[in-house]
């Protein structure tokens, strides 16, 4: 039998099936064939799960004396943590679910709950989701202020008044306030704001970050974003790649290393060093603190206020020095342009600037 005959037979089978669908009597409890039925079935498939329901699970969780940390896992949307003078944990987990109808959607939301796991000194609260449909969860939780809190994989985290905070794998904005100890973790793509914290150690990428009144120093790895540190204390150490770093009124030593972008130090209160490549650097001096500035290919600018006493040692290789604002003329020998000068009275702090293929600007 050839291909032509097989195609003819297949055609008869298809036509016969269609004729049967049009002419066969309906089964008991069903309707006969119609194009309306086909359309309704297709529309039902395209609509997916039109049902919607919201459920809030509220509970109080007792703590044992040995618990030191709360870990919150698999909350799909925002997490809000509030530290209080209390001995237990109180939470409200809000679940939004879809389903084929509202009643079924509510049943799915009812099945979306926290599972508790005690791991050494950590209490773990992990959201368990049903296999059916799709659920979104948000959490508001009140905890004892003595607890460290770790949040993973949420979309937006707000935390206040706890012993320490760790953020891992989250998205959305992060706002942390009044954290007695360390703020640690990794974050990317959305803003981070930390106010009143013991210390900070974070890796940040493609975002804006703001840190204010951190008492015990900051260690940051910043990539492709903006980072501002205000009125903090302790040592600051920043690794920067293609970022804009601003440190203002830091009461502790500061080191910024890396390449590309921009670094601004305003009124440093202790010894500071900027070691960059291909980055613009600006330092404003209001007191007697030693500063070292190293960069290439971009402008290095130092602004020396009247309140500062400074022994300046500046040299640009294959570049220039602009000092007209302070009525000074640099000296050029070969490819090196130098400016050495004492600003203020008495013995000042040593300020060293080295730039390659870039300009040095000295201003008041």
Question: What positions do the PLM features span?
Answer:
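Intrinsically disordered, low-complexity terminal regions
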Residues: 1-364
């Amino acid at each position: 039998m050839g291909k032509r005959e097989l195609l003819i037979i297949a055609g008869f089978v298809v036509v016969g099936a269609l004729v049967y669908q049009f002419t066969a009597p309906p089964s008991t409890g069903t309707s006969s064939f119609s194009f309306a039925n086909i359309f309704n079935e297709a529309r039902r498939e395209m609509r997916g799960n039109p049902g919607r329901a919201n459920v809030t699970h509220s509970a109080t969780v007792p703590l044992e004396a040995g618990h030191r940390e709360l870990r919150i896992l698999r909350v799909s949307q925002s997490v809000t943590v509030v530290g209080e003078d209390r001995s237990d944990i109180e939470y409200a987990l809000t679940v939004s679910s879809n389903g084929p109808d509202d009643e079924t959607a509510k049943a799915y939301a009812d099945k979306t709950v926290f599972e508790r796991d005690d791991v050494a000194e950590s209490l773990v609260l992990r959201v368990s989701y049903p296999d059916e449909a799709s659920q979104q969860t948000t959490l508001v939780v009140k905890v004892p202020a003595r607890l460290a809190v770790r949040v993973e994989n949420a979309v937006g985290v707000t935390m206040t008044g706890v012993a320490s905070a760790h953020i891992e794998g989250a998205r959305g904005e992060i706002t942390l306030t009044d954290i007695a100890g360390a703020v640690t973790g990794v974050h990317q793509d959305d803003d981070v704001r930390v106010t009143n914290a013991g210390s900070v150690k974070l890796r940040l990428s493609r975002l804006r970050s703001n840190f204010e009144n951190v008492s015990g120093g900051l260690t940051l790895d910043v990539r492709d974003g903006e980072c501002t540190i205000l009125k903090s204390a302790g040592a600051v150490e920043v690794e920067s790649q293609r970022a804009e770093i601003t440190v203002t009124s830091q009461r502790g030593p500061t080191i910024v290393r890396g390449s590309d972008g921009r670094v601004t130090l305003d009124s440093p209160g202790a010894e500071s060093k900027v070691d960059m490549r291909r980055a613009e650097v600006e330092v404003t001096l209001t007191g007697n603190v030693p500063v070292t500035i190293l960069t290439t290919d971009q402008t290095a600018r130092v602004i020396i206020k009247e309140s500062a006493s400074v022994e300046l040692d500046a040299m640009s290789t294959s570049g220039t020095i602009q000092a007209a604002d302070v009525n000074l003329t640099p000296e050029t020998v070969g490819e090196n342009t130098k400016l050495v000068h004492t600003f203020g009275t008495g013995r000042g702090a040593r300020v060293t600037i080295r730039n390659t293929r870039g300009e040095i600007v000295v201003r008041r």
